[in-house]
Amino acid sequence: MASRIIKHFGVTEPHIIRAALLHDSVEDVPGRLAYGLMVPDEEIDDLKHRPAALQTIADMFGEDTAELVANVTNPEFDRSGDTQVQYREHVVELMHEHPEARVIKLSDFIDNCKGLNHNERPLAAIQRLARKYYPLIETMREFALAEDTPIPEQGKAYINESLDVAGERCEYYISLS
């Protein structure tokens, strides 16, 4: 994902690249990030330890990197509601408020969508992901092409083409329903 940001998006700001490398760490391994190997992650309450994980990132890589990681970290969604709708609302808010975070979220989104055909989960799970991502493709395109998105024009062209492929992949898996 970080290599796509550098090679294809044309973005080389160090704090953005660092945040791209760390983008899932607060969601996936907050306990290990905050406390090392002392406690297995499955025994740690992720929400409780996210602030400590973000502080570790700030201490090691700087506040600007930690802020970007915090921005792209998905919140805990209300499981009693529609988590896909909550995810889409979160992404739109994030993309609207944080132009630098768009760079990371766009790369992650493209990676997730284009990678559907490499996903080893059961077909039903892949279809759920396709239905989660597909409604956001045009929104992602709008934010990618926005003037305040800190990506050079050639990077925006790459994103535009990649979102076309992402849409095709999502449509394919949705059509298998």
Regions found by a protein language model. Give the residues of each.
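Active-site helical microenvironments for divalent-metal-assisted chemistry
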Residues: M1-S177
